[in-house]
Swiss-Prot record:
SUPFAM superfamilies: alpha/beta-Hydrolases
Active-site feature positions: 158, 331, 364
Task of the protein: Transfers an acetyl group from acetyl-CoA to L-homoserine, forming acetyl-L-homoserine.
InterPro entries cross-referenced by the UniProt entry: AB_hydrolase_1, AB_hydrolase_fold, HAT_MetX-like
Enzyme Commission designation: 2.3.1.31
Pathway in which the depicted protein is active: Amino-acid biosynthesis; L-methionine biosynthesis via de novo pathway; O-acetyl-L-homoserine from L-homoserine: step 1/1
Domain spans labelled AB hydrolase-1: 53-370
EC class (word): transferase
GO cellular component: cytoplasm
GO biological process, any: homoserine metabolic process
Originating species: Gluconobacter oxydans (strain 621H) (Gluconobacter suboxydans)
Gene for this chain: metXA
Subcellular location: Cytoplasm
Listed name of the protein: Homoserine O-acetyltransferase
Keyword Acyltransferase attached: yes
Amino acid sequence: MDISASPSIADGPVYTHQTVRLDSGLDLECGVHLAPLEVAYCTYGTLSPARDNAILVCHALTGDQYLAERNPLTGKPGWWSRMVGPGLPIDTDRYFVVCSNVLGGCMGTTGPRSICAETGKAWDSEFPPITMHDIVAAQAKLIDHLGIDRLFAVIGGSMGGMQALTWAADFPDRVFAAMPIATSPFHSAQNIAFNEVSRQAIFADPDWHDGHYRDFGAIPARGLGVARMMAHITYLSEEALSRKFGRRVRHDAATAVPASSSPSLFGEMFEVESYLRHQGSSFVRRFDANSYLTITRAMDYFDLAAEHDGDLANPFRKSQTRFCVVSFSSDWLFPTSQSRLLVRALNRAGANVSFVEIESDRGHDAFLLEEPDFDRTIRGFIAGAAEHAALKAGER
């Protein structure tokens, strides 16, 4: 087992970035034994002597382990730096926070870019199919490695919320509290459809090369960029788009988008067009197309009820976890109706569950943005859970 570590105090809370190599590997649900297993992760704060103050934060589809410090690849602040840190709702002065790159990702955890032990070459598009259960099983191996028997909390938004629910279902004795945010216990037909259009955009790119594009010194940038553009629309709301862009045009269209983007064929470019092109072009510089395909498919497979005789209550009947389910009023990707369905199932299972719908016009991405009511909800739930757990947070 090899570990590389790099502690830092720059641009955020004190953290350590590590990659752990587990030679024992991981048995995937598809039947493939994946070995070795590498998991890249960051930790923030200090684990208490009782090892009872650990919070696992799970990232969304295109997130990574750089939760609260400057991302070394993009140079931008961590994706939840406004939420995680000293004195913030997820307080690193009190809690030991862990965030790992998911299985199938492209930021250090085993995924399509990794070398297949049998062939000596990168997996690329031949990386085996994975599920949300596989993703969580890899995280569980990391938590075992850290010597943590029970997580105080698992928190995640969007696909991160799917992971939080899977933790509570698959490890009912290892999670005291769970906060699934802007998520669902299944991936809807609409969301599967969005993902399929994204995948087809990648497949249609002439640089796709059946997923072995790196052998040709290429990446399917056009297709992956279009996939990101379309996905980004689903993360916003009509109100947010109207407020941010309206029907305004860019009079400097020639310099408004990177040179690699196709020029507008119809005169001046709308600001929303320029914005989407920027999102697409910046995304392809940091994310791998095969990882995008692998992870979106894992999301599509996700359906906790179908795996338990069609009854969503069944996976939680043995769970001792305390839940706080959070939705946002303008989120049409994971609408409040799906959160209510989850809450009703948790009630049937006899779980301790609270539900909060945050009024916001910012759409699905609201959980990543400044929302005072949401901040108070997270802070309050964590404090209440700590009280019920008799957690002596801050005594380290």
